[in-house]
């Protein structure tokens, strides 16, 4: 018998005084952790299957369950942590690349938490958002350097297509296939209700969701899955995905187990086949090639839709953004290294890319220095966790923010980081009909509306406290920010002063 070096990560603690053996946990767990033992007349658990999704804990009618981290410990070693040792065991057992989902969980600096916001006191009165108007409306797209009027006072400057947002927040790209039909419906309906946008991701747009096109951003990625004329015409904007924060430099991969039924038809690939996106776009090897695709998409959409270029936050991101701003693109979306994903190689997710805070500040400053900041809007994502992160991002230079993981949390995600298995017990990252139906889009979209509405209220309160009454006045206003515990170089890149200055 071979020795199994892979110990369970979690322990299922069942209170026998509370457990009534109703078997709800058994029915609800897609990982088959729980079972009823007829001989023992009790519930038992196979803890090696547990991913800590908390479905059983939430559904238990008597609160008899809790999931705890196992106390299996190796001899303490600052270099070789228990997690690192287990990863070596896993690869020695399988011979495969380690896969993970969601964003980078490593204890690297979170710069949002080291930046503090200003508030008005005495000499500069604050504004009460309950009694005075606050403008959170945002327009994304190219802006003219000056406005010209004719002799009658009418504007004669050509204004390029713009995206109008009621609040500077959008739902980031999550493809149909990586997440469920019901999750997509929740996002689309919430975007329509809020007056913002959701992004289809690289899996095409289900025919049922074309009616939400006015609040939809359609994506064109290297695999070109589901891309056709009607698809490009359906959305309010077109996004070219050049990179993703969770896995810069590589393409996407959706396993064949998720390519079923409508997912297959929407992506226009055979059922059961793996959807593998190439690392590069095979028609883009330069800024000139990118410009050609930008204008091809503009031509295909009769120049009525803004074109977004999405890139990962990498070391030379400012120079890359400078080139994109000259390519004819209307919006640049930058995805930080903590950005979520349905599946990515663990080593790439945890070691490639840079924090979105530094990337945003560097890009905004570079475009300003070159006098081309008005040529593009900047949208940032990659772990925007709260309204405070949104305010700080806008003060650093962003026009709007993408949220993905926060939106999934609102739908019930518990960050068990097992999206790649397709067994999501919350009906989000799965295509199994019995699991998908657990996410009710009538409830899901309302929870998303509640989340963004709550953030909007908080944004207004923070802006009012600063004595600012519009997003326009906050954008790039780095004087409203101060750093804590940052070194001189970090402060220089962020373009902010240290607290106390």
Predicted regions span which residues?
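Conserved, well-structured core domains of diverse proteins
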Residues: 1-6, 10, 33, 42, ...
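Structural beta-strand/beta-sheet cores of well-ordered domains, especially the beta-sheet scaffolds
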Residues: 10, 167-172, 194-196, 214-216, ...
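Short, well-ordered alpha-helical microsegments
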Residues: 53, 226, 317-320
